Amino acid sequence: MIGSEGTLGIITEIVVGLAVRPETPATIIATFPHIKSAAAAAAALLKFKPSMLEIIDQTTLKAVESWHPLGFEIAGSVLLMQLDEDQDRADEVLKLCESFEMIDGAASTDAADAVEFIRVRKLAYPALERLGATLLDDVAVPISKIAELVERVEALSTKYDLTIGIFGHAGDGNMHPTIVHDHGDLKAQERAIAAFGEIVEIAQSLGGTASGEHGIGSIKQGFAAAELSPAVIELQRAIKKAFDPKGILNPGKKLP
């Protein structure tokens, strides 16, 4: 059922198991001169088993700074990390980041500091949204390909004359390209849709996927078909028919 996007059934009851919330997680923020160094650092930081590992590109940072100045004027990228365990290793994390050209960094187990550190990530989408209409979705790539994805999307931004910011979950390569275009400008909207399609194709060419967490729905069915073999598609359709012979569960979604 997981990942079927409502095409195989409905949930009538959920049993939730809650983990104990860590008392004093360590929150770490680090700035880098460019996305390459930040992405390389993110890959190296996985050994610390972070509960959060977020990355923000320069375009998004500029949008945030123009709205709520937070001191990221010279940063090319920002990493945010949280350690629920081994909080005392925060200094070790910052030391490792230094080997990846870190400009500046800080760590704290104080809750108020954590809120302030994470603020830039909370403002990422709203900051881009205030610039115009947005087309936001997600793609996922191997962590080692995050920098290349961002650099190729920057080229698309120039090609289509659009602002495209990227932020997302560096811990699993799930990125959120956010395309900004003028409200009411139909030609700009068409360019945004074309850019969106190319972003998905870039992700797929890098060994990634059309969707990391937002799902396929109806918008990405064609891209999903490009990733799956005919045999896999037929198997999925057979499973759908077995669970939903009348085709009444979220019809027309997910399946290519």
What are these regions (language model features)?
Residues 1-256:
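Noncatalytic alpha-helical scaffold of FAD-dependent oxidoreductases
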